[in-house]
Amino acid sequence: DSVNIGILANKASTARELLARLSTAYENLPKWMQQGILVWNKGNIELENGSKILASSTSASAVRGMSFNILFLDEFAFVPNHVADSFFASVYPTITSGKSTKVIIVSTPHGMNHFYRMWHDAERNKNEYIPTEVHWSEVPGRDVVWKEQTIANTSEEQFRVEFECLGGDTEIEILDDNGIVQKTSMENLYERL
């Protein structure tokens, strides 16, 4: 059976880089597992069994009219909100038409946007997405020494944003001990804890 995969990212160059990594993995398969190749370039791969992989930037028209078994969306929180909204409006009919279609969304959080709504709705079981978090400390080779070196090479703020997923200027609402809703930044909340 053939499989159609869409790799979409906030920038076309990022999607092409992901396709290049997948291409390298394919090249390292034993020859007997590799299918014949019909198309092999920076933007797509097509195999003789009919399977296709497309790499593109996320936009409303990027995959319109196409059908996919797997749709991989990278750094989706960095796709402008109006683009993310129109993208899902145009692609959702395709997603729901397949019985086994999978949508995989990967991102570092980036403010309160389409990704934020999807994530928080998933946490509250308001949609069918399954939120999965991978903390930096779960990645082999990343320990306290790695953290300290990374902070020394960048900054504590950058580490919190990129690895702890805490944006210092991200505004949130919290309920204080008196039941009063207050707006605060993630940085202020982080310092309070």
Q: Across the structure, where does each feature detected by a protein language model lie?
A:
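GGW-centered surface loops in extracellular recognition modules
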Residues: 172
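Phosphate/NTP-binding elements of NTP-utilizing enzymes
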Residues: 1-167, 175-192
